[in-house]
């Protein structure tokens, strides 16, 4: 949702940084890898050890580099297909690391009830499925724009919940995870419905390589 409407306001901050990266001859792929490495490192080091405020601030800061690499690519005439694949892969890794670290902290430090741990695991799995449904739908030629809970929403809600919990606000992470779990399940269904309503939805797919394509004469 924010992915569609939040880019233009953010460009006011992102574009000057992107221009600096170009002057320093930093490539989009380098930015992608550095951003992912720092985000994963901060999440896995700070969240399980209970440094929630710093984890929220630094994870949010490093994750913001995900916008800079794309802007650098566009300023240089457009990104490559490999760059897009690398970026999507790193996004999945960072999402998994974030919710994996949150789940680890819930179990070993927060003394969370099993239901909340389950909600965190739902967020972890759904973060991957939401992106996969979009990627698979677009590969089939469907238009898959939008969705209630996309990556920006996941990051904002989870990191705000972590930060507020670190400040002592009761049940902040509980509310954040339950909201994300419910919203993520809804988004998976929303995107499947979107794919099902596409004009191309009932077209037949090609048989996999080596598989028999026509069984019409089979008795």
UniProtKB/Swiss-Prot annotation:
Keywords noted in UniProt: Cell membrane, Lipid biosynthesis, Lipid metabolism, Magnesium, Membrane, Metal-binding, Phospholipid biosynthesis, Phospholipid metabolism, Transferase, Transmembrane, Transmembrane helix
Cofactor list: Mg(2+)
Main location: membrane
Entry-linked PROSITE patterns: CDP_ALCOHOL_P_TRANSF (PS00379)
Free-text remark on how the cofactor is bound: Contains a di-nuclear catalytic Mg(2+) center.
GO molecular function, a single term: magnesium ion binding
Pathway recorded for this protein: Phospholipid metabolism; phosphatidylinositol phosphate biosynthesis
Compartment list: Cell membrane
Reactions catalysed, as given in the entry: a CDP-1,2-diacyl-sn-glycerol + 1D-myo-inositol 3-phosphate = a 1,2-diacyl-sn-glycero-3-phospho-(1D-myo-inositol-3-phosphate) + CMP + H(+); 1,2-di-(9Z-octadecenoyl)-sn-glycero-3-cytidine-5'-diphosphate + 1D-myo-inositol 3-phosphate = 1,2-di-(9Z-octadecenoyl)-sn-glycero-3-phospho-(1D-myo-inositol-3-phosphate) + CMP + H(+)
The keyword Metal-binding belongs to this UniProt entry's keyword annotation: yes
Function: Catalyzes the conjugation of the 1'-hydroxyl group of D-myo-inositol-3-phosphate (also named L-myo-inositol-1-phosphate) with a lipid tail of cytidine diphosphate diacylglycerol (CDP-DAG), forming phosphatidylinositol phosphate (PIP) and CMP. PIP is a precursor of phosphatidylinositol (PI) which is an essential lipid required for cell wall formation.
Family to which the UniProt record says this protein belongs: Belongs to the CDP-alcohol phosphatidyltransferase class-I family.
Entry protein name: Phosphatidylinositol phosphate synthase
């Amino acid at each position: 949702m924010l992915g569609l409407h939040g880019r233009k306001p953010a460009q006011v901050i992102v574009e000057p940084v992107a221009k600096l990266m170009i002057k320093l001859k930093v490539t989009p792929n380098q930015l992608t890898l550095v951003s992912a490495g720092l985000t994963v490192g901060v999440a896995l080091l700070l969240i399980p050890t209970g440094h929630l405020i710093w984890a929220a601030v630094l994870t949010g800061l490093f994750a913001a580099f995900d916008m800079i690499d794309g802007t650098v690519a566009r300023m240089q005439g457009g990104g490559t297909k490999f760059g897009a694949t690398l970026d999507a892969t790193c996004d999945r890794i960072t999402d998994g690391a974030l919710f994996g670290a949150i789940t680890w902290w819930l179990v070993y430090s927060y003394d969370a009830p099993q239901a909340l741990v389950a909600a965190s695991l739902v967020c972890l799995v759904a973060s991957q499925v939401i992106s996969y449904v979009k990627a698979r739908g677009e590969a089939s030629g469907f238009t898959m724009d939008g969705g209630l809970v996309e990556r920006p929403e996941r990051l904002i809600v989870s990191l705000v919940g972590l930060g507020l919990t670190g400040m002592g606000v009761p049940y902040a992470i509980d509310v954040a995870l339950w909201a994300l779990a419910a919203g993520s399940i809804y988004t998976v269904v929303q995107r499947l419905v979107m794919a099902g309503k596409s004009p191309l939805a009932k077209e037949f797919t090609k048989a996999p390589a080596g598989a028999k394509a026509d069984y019409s004469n089979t008795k």
